[in-house]
Design a protein with these regions (language model features):
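Conserved ABC ATPase "signature" region
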Residues: 97, 101-104, 109-127
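ABC transporter nucleotide-binding domain
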Residues: 173-260
């Protein structure tokens, strides 16, 4: 199954351009949409989830017109929004059972089989009788995935699913998404580079409503590996280096500041070639330093 987005645009009433002629082809498997907050990711997710209208463009899920055939899309869609509410005094089992009825699973035995299976798949079986108000953030996100999987959707959209999760819950959630992505098209929207690096076979970087880069993560890393240089500097030296070089990132490492710069030639001043990562691709692209053709997105 393939999702084709062509020249999708959206401008809000206050003049903010959320999407500017976005064009993407999203194949089966895990696809990462990576960008900072305010890049237009959530607007795109809501349009694809048939919750918001666009101004122009087209979206096709195989041969289904997503913008015109919303009911058909909803029958094969699972959606986990960035923010979603639950009934805090209802148990996980009862609420998932209720959602299953709303999805059309009216036969009690079949519904029980589906609900039981999803709670086990999301590692919530042992807490199925707990009220949702007692769940941690990670448990709530896994419950969100369980409801998104009702109806065996072919397309799943998850918007910023790991924001706010502790490292252990993030690993658990990554494993869950990885299993799901083996059988479906999963569109993952995030500002966390490691989410895409760990999970996605294909990705795109979006900022200010425009797709800047797309491709396979490892291929994008290969495309930048000759241009990344690194060295340690003191905190006092950092502003001067930022003025003289295209510094794309800085971070503390063992109490010292490690900077990465983007340069086509040796920048001198003690810089050494650095092994490029997806972080370098992301930061250089967002900063406007790395501008290859977007290609056939």
């Amino acid at each position: 199954m393939q999702l084709k987005i062509r020249n999708l645009s959206k401008t809000y009433a206050n003049g903010v351009v959320a999407l500017d002629r976005v064009t993407l082809t999203i194949p089966a498997g895990m696809f990462g949409l990576l960008g900072p907050n305010g890049a237009g990711k959530s607007t795109l997710m809501r349009i694809l989830a048939t919750l918001q209208e666009c101004d122009a463009g087209s979206v096709f899920l195989d041969d289904i017109d997503v913008l015109d055939e919303k009911d058909a899309v909803r029958r094969m869609l699972g959606y986990l929004p960035q923010d979603f509410g639950v009934y805090p005094k209802v148990t996980a089992y009862d609420l998932l059972d209720h959602f299953a009825q709303l999805k059309g699973l009216s036969h009690r035995a079949r519904r029980r089989e589906v609900v039981d299976g999803l709670l086990q798949q999301t590692n919530l079986w042992d807490v199925r009788a707990q009220r949702l108000g007692t769940f941690s953030g990670g448990m709530r996100q896994r419950f969100g995935i369980a409801q998104a999987l009702l109806g065996d959707p072919r397309l799943i959209i998850v918007d910023e699913p790991t924001a706010g999760l502790d490292p252990q819950e993030r690993v658990r959630f990554h494993n869950l998404l990885s299993d799901i992505g083996e059988e479906r098209t999963v569109l993952l929207s995030t500002h966390i580079v490691s989410d895409v690096a760990d999970l996605c076979a294909n990705m795109a970087i979006i900022n200010k409503g425009q797709v800047l880069l797309c491709g396979e993560p490892q291929e994008l890393i290969y495309g930048i590996e000759d241009f990344i240089w690194a060295r340690f500097v003191t905190k006092a030296e950092l502003p001067a280096f930022q003025a003289r070089h295209s510094v794309i990132s800085s971070r503390l490492l063992s109490g010292r500041t490690l900077i990465h710069v983007y340069a086509e030639d040796d920048p001198g001043e003690g810089f050494e070639p650095a092994r490029a990562s997806l972080d370098d691709v992301y930061f250089a692209t967002i900063a406007g330093r790395h501008n290859p053709a977007a290609g056939n997105c």
